[in-house]
Amino acid sequence: MKKVLALVVAAAMGLSSAAFAAETATTPAPTATTTKAAPAKTTHHKKQHKAAPAQKAQAAKKHHKNTKAEQKAPEQKAQAAKKHAGKHGHQQPAKPAAQPAA
């Protein structure tokens, strides 16, 4: 296992694996190079997921109206009634017949 590790390290450093293997066989490797430092502790931040809104049709998104709770539609009138809404004053109501004073 140590030889495999030595070969991997040698390949990573760009040295000849044969020369490095011969060198490590004759001299013991220092312990500082083979020990690994403990990795730094990483903190994982969790994202806060919002609840997905209900899906709507595209037209409903574009033409959103601010509707009040159960608003009644006004009564529909004929077109002429809309145009002449304020012109009812020209007709005077019929006066009751004058009664002779006795």
Curated annotation (Swiss-Prot):
Signal peptide: 1-21
Biased composition (Low complexity): 22-41, 91-102
Pfam families with a match to the protein in the record: Asr
Comp. bias regions, Basic residues: 80-90
Compartment annotation: Periplasm
Free-text function comment from the UniProt entry: Required for growth and/or survival at acidic conditions.
UniProt protein name: Acid shock protein
The gene coding this protein: asr
